[in-house]
């Protein structure tokens, strides 16, 4: 919520207030558990404790999927969730990042994807450094450039038709709809050679 001499505004999410009133994050306060906001007819506002506070147990469903990704805390949490997947992903592809393409579905998974990519790039940087150091100065300039040229492979592999929402369909019709809701970017990977890693946050009714 935000209160000034001219306005009192309450919203379910902080970024909305920041955008409308052009406020820094420090100016928007959070109503704590057990508290209420009472606004009188004359404009006086009071924040009161109406119930003893209990343990805070935020819903991961809301933090991962429903909340606005433009909130600074939500953004950083989603990036961290992606970064934390790094080691398990590397194990699943046998640490073969040269034959693995990374992408995301749907667009709301993009923030976690950035965190995953940062984790993967940090891992690859360590591999490059260790390989160069292990050769004890015996590498030529061309060999060093070859090592440094290794990159995490990333592509926009699936493009969703924004008019179609699979989780609101029912039964067999949903399976048929889900099969056509994404358009694949053809030629971006080699069948039978490349691994494909997709980060997906469709936890409502993911397909």
Residue ranges of model-derived segments:
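A phosphate-binding catalytic loop at a beta-strand-loop-alpha-helix junction
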Residues: 195-207
């Amino acid at each position: 919520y935000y209160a000034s001499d001219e306005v009192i505004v309450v919203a379910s999410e902080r970024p909305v207030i920041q955008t409308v009133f052009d406020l820094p994050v420090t100016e928007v306060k959070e109503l704590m558990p057990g508290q209420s906001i009472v606004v009188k007819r004359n404009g006086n506002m009071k924040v009161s404790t109406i119930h003893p506070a209990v343990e805070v147990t935020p819903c991961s469903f809301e933090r991962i999927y429903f909340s606005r990704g433009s909130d600074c805390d939500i953004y950083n949490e989603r990036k961290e969730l992606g970064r934390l997947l790094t080691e398990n992903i590397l194990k699943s592809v046998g640490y073969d990042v040269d034959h693995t393409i990374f992408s995301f579905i749907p667009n709301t998974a993009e923030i976690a994807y950035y965190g995953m990519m940062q984790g993967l790039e940090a891992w690859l940087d360590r591999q490059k450094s260790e390989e160069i150091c292990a050769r004890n100065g015996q590498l030529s300039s061309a060999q060093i450039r070859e090592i440094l040229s290794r990159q995490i492979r990333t592509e926009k592999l699936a493009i969703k038709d924004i008019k179609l929402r699979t989780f609101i369909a029912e039964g067999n019709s949903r399976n048929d709809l889900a099969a056509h809701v994404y358009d694949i970017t053809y030629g971006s990977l080699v069948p039978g050679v490349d691994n494909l890693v997709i980060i997906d946050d469709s936890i409502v009714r993911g397909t």
